[in-house]
A protein has these predicted regions:
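Gram-negative/organellar outer-membrane beta-barrel architecture
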Residues: 4-12, 20-162, 256-259, 315-316, ...
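Short, well-ordered amphipathic alpha-helices
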Residues: 30-37, 68-70, 168-174, 209-213, ...
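C-terminal outer-membrane beta-barrel translocator/porin domains of Gram-negative envelope proteins
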Residues: 155-159, 163-288, 337
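Small/polar glycine-rich anion-binding or flexible loop at a beta-alpha turn
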Residues: 280-284, 294-300, 321-323
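C-terminal soluble interaction/assembly domains
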Residues: 287-288, 293-296, 307-309
């Protein structure tokens, strides 16, 4: 029934997602998602739906934000455009870049308030599942720390700063479904080049490579594996250094100049539209390759349940309970935990 409603001319999916992220506390995100199916049958890597979403969020520690985004396909699925805008105010704890014993038990409280947007276009190479892309990202960010100047562990930062840069990318995508894939591969290499000539206060570069594989093991048993790494070079602001994003790891808790992580997931569709999920991951963050002894590492794992709320679109929704050495977290999932447009 939900799939049929989404297929209507003005069909939309109301979104109400509880937030249980350890870094910001309990809260909720609300919004509307408009989906339109392409003409004809979708096949692996082709026939993606257009998606428009608008929403907002708030949490118990005073963090809040609003966002709008649109993913659209043109010229018989040869061109994909992505446009997004957000304004947020997030109250977070700074634990250092890499391992910093001074901040392990006494992190520094700060507020991060970015306002910005991104535009991106990806062009399909021939009739293949390879895409070449180019984007531009810009944001104005205000940073305030509760700690006074000279506090041990306080990072170098500018209260008000701008970042602007080009983000070329190369993507290979054969997933059979955008929301909850059963099979296929997603690999993307993304480079960010930020420079004063492009609107940035600082000159730095950021590189990220992510690979995701989905494999059906049996008719009702599906395996997924995600591995990715990221690195920054130059004078990147501390809040743009990469961080571990495993389920169970608080947002921006494990940061470094370089980050690598891997996560595996097994989903068993045991009855009708219901599934059980188990997952485990490992991540590492460090400052540079010459000081690997300062590496922060984390092992996570957990389990969850899913229900297929829109069969035509392959949208599964559910809840995950994740465990880490110093934390237990609950996540509400709409689609894959590793969703990529």
């Amino acid at each position: 029934m939900l799939s049929g409603f989404l297929d209507e001319k003005y069909g939309f999916l109301p979104v109400l997602i509880p937030i249980t992220e350890p870094a910001v506390g309990y809260g909720a995100a609300v919004g509307l998602a408009f989906l339109s199916r392409p003409l004809g049958e979708a096949r692996a890597g082709f026939g993606r739906p257009d998606i428009t979403i608008a929403g907002g969020l708030g949490t118990e520690n005073g963090s809040w934000g609003v966002l709008v985004g649109d993913v659209r396909h043109w010229f018989d699925d040869r061109l994909e455009t992505q446009v997004g805008f957000t304004h947020m105010s997030a109250n977070l704890d700074f634990h250092g870049i890499g391992q910093d014993a001074r901040l392990d038990d006494h992190p520094l409280r700060y507020n991060l308030e970015p306002t910005g947007g991104v535009v991106r276009a990806k062009y399909r190479l021939g009739d293949s599942t390879f895409w070449a892309g180019l984007g531009y990202a810009f944001a104005v960010t205000r940073v305030t720390f509760d700690a006074p100047a000279g506090t041990p562990g306080l990072p170098d930062f500018t209260r008000d700063s701008k970042v602007g840069g080009l983000t070329p990318s190369f993507t290979y995508d054969t997933r059979d479904n955008l929301f909850t894939p059963l099979r296929g591969t997603f690999v993307e290499a993304l480079v960010g080049v930020f420079d004063p000539a492009l609107g940035s206060d600082d000159e730095f570069q950021r590189v990220q490579v992510i690979a995701i594989q989905y494999v059906p093991l049996l008719r009702t048993l599906y395996f997924g594996l995600r591995a990715d790494g990221a690195a920054t070079f130059g004078d990147a602001p501390f809040y743009l250094r990469p961080f571990i994003t495993l389920r169970g790891a608080p947002i921006m808790r494990y940061q470094g100049d370089e980050v690598a992580q891997i996560e595996a997931e097994l989903r068993w569709q045991f009855w009708n539209r219901f599934s059980a999920v188990g997952f485990a991951g490992f991540g590492a963050a460090w400052n540079d390759f010459e000081r690997l002894h300062n590496t922060q590492t984390i092992v996570t794992g957990g389990f969850g349940v899913r229900y297929e709320i829109a069969r035509k679109y392959g949208i599964h929704m559910g809840i995950d309970l994740a465990f880490a050495p110093d934390n237990t977290a609950v996540y509400i999932q709409v689609g894959s935990a590793w969703a990529r447009p």
